[in-house]
Structures are given as C-alpha cells and as structure tokens.
Amino acid sequence: INRYYELFREHGIPVGQVLTMKENFATRRHYLNQKNCMTVMLENGVIPIVNENDTISVSELMFTDNDELSGLIASMMDAQALIILSNIDGIYNGSPADPASEVIREIGQGKDLSSYIQTSKSSFGRGGMLTKTNIARKVADEGITVIIANGKRDNILVDLIQHPESTLCTRFTPSPEPVSSVKKWIAHSEGFAKGELHINYCATELLFSDKAVSILPVGIIDVIGEFEKDDIVRIIDFGGKPIGVGKANCDSTQAREAMGKHGKKPVVHYDYLYIE
C-alpha cells in the first residue's frame, strides 16, 4: 500500500486501503455495505486500493486470485471498464511463444476460446489466463468493457486510455443489454450456493430464449441440498450442466413439495436469476 501511496501522492491523489474477504460478497447486505464504503471514498476523491485480507480469510473461501477480486469489484461498482494486466499482450490465437501467433484484438459474446487458452500461471500471481478469460467474459456480459493487456509494457495504462486503437491488447465487447445491480451480485455468487435446482428440457429451452422467464416448480425435476429462502442455488439443466445461479424464493422443503406442479409461485424469480 505504501507503494501506491507514494505513486498517487506524486499527483496529489489520496488513496485508502480496503481489505475484504470473499465472505463479504456472500450476502446482499455485506455486498452493499462494501459498495457504499467505496462509493463514499470515491465521492471524496480517495482512490480505493482493494486487496484480500489474507490474515483472516478462510482458505476454502479465498479468492481464486486478484483477477476474480477485480471482476467482483468492477461489477459491484458498476465500472465503465476493467483492465486486467498480465505478462503477455492479451489472448493469442495460438501459443504466445509461437512467432506466428497473433493477439486477438476483439472478442465478441459467445466466441469459443477454449483452444486458445494456456493453463500456465502468470508470473504476477496465482492466477492464469484461463481465470482471466472467465472473469473477463462474465464481467463483459454485465455490460462492462474488459481489456487484457501486458503490465510489463511501459505506460500501458496511459496508452490504453489515450491510444486505445493502436495499443496492443485484447478487448472483450460488453453486452449492450443493461444488467441490474442484483443480478450482478448473483452472477458472482456461485461459490456460495447452498443447493441445486435441476430443470427439465422445456425449462432449459425457455431460459435461453428471449423471454423473461422465472424458474417454476413445473419445470423442476430434482432439488439437491438443504437451503433457506433467499439462499443462492445453482441451476442445473436436464443434461447435468450448470447453467446459472439464482436466489431462492422458498426453502428446499417447499421447493420439493411444489416440484413438478402447475400453478405454483416461482422457486427463483427472473429478477433474481442469472443464466450464464
């Protein structure tokens, strides 16, 4: 933090350290408390420097790496853009070590990148390009521009802002559809899920249509785990694939009682449902 303090002081900008834990994103109340804290800092001209509180974080609930933390913060603060710095220039269409490989400059929604991603970790931390890509895609789907660039290049941040077209990087195109603050919170809550809702083929098809669809009991074929009302649950399609998360509108006992029946209230309402 002293390094950031010295760097920003040269420009007359105060900074403040914010230590957080993954658990602080588990409930909506804690989530909003963090957002309000950092909003007040920014309104008073103080730049938050956010890091994980390693001294008290439970290992099972630690962030995967700082890329995951940055994605959560960008989403929570409704940022215009997220810049993730790595030790390479972006995502390549082949191995970065291959001279014939080129940086993919623009990545649109739905583009399959599985054949391009290396699993080796960055020298900057414990995360690799796979983590960076997963976070970038999720945050871009929430309407935030995401850029992956080389943090070892001199003046990279200045160049990205002042010369975006000529600066080598990978840019993830943001979704044009607005995403509510609640859905942004839910989108990053998969790690806190207390149970699962398994849905049938028809329900799965409807969720991926253009309609605003809630998860009704008639489309549920199984309820796994024990959860309370307002807990986070995973949504599993008819083939066993996780496709999203949502906030339960009832507890697991009520969900099992209503499962497969018509005319019942939603188990997960559309407003509290995030589909990948």
Residue ranges of predicted features:
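C-terminal catalytic "cap/lid" subdomain
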Residues: 1-276
